[in-house]
A protein has these predicted regions:
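Bacterial carbohydrate/catabolite-sensing allosteric modules
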Residues: 1-167
Length: 167
């Protein structure tokens, strides 16, 4: 969201995931925080829920934005698939990307580099996350076998902005 704001975008829609998974909550809170830190008013009407987190939801939400003339200049999607759907809708409606509406995804799936225009996204190191999660599982299993308390550990893993043509 910071990247979109640095590009001059101020009316940023958010295609968020379902209300419960923590990653969906965290990305929504990050969206809110970036708006607040940049003194951009939060508009609940610019937040759309993607229950399935797929391209058709991104397409449908983007079409709704265009039909209702919501004056959006960017979209931040919870994952790459809804962002891909938004791009498809914008292209079919002859909206220029990123000049009129920029689109940003999250996850850096292969499709993000294959579509036209290519999708700017946030890369998260999935293999490293998987290895850390497995190590936590092993540590907790060992602690339980030894009848020791399980110690809560917090890991922060860096993500990387991948800037492509959609922003």
């Amino acid at each position: 969201v910071e990247h979109l704001i640095k590009k001059g975008k101020k009316r940023i829609a958010h295609f968020r995931g379902p209300l419960l998974p923590q990653n969906s909550i965290d990305r929504f809170l990050g969206y809110r925080q970036a708006l607040e830190e940049n003194r951009i008013e939060y508009d609940k009407d610019l937040v759309f829920i993607c229950d399935e987190i797929n391209d058709s939801e991104g397409y449908d939400h983007m079409q709704q934005i265009l039909d209702q003339k919501m004056d959006v200049d960017a979209v931040f999607a919870v994952a790459d698939l809804p962002a891909v759907g938004a791009i498809k809708c914008l292209i079919e409606n002859k909206v220029h990307i990123p000049e009129e509406v920029a689109v940003m995804g999250f996850s850096n799936w292969l499709i993000s580099s294959l579509i036209t225009p290519s999708l700017s996204t946030i890369d998260q190191p999935g293999e490293l996350i998987g290895r850390k999660a497995f190590q936590v599982f092993l540590d907790e299993s060992d602690a339980k076998k030894r009848k020791e308390p399980v110690v809560f550990k917090k890991y922060e893993i860096e993500t990387t902005l991948i800037e492509r043509k959609s922003t």
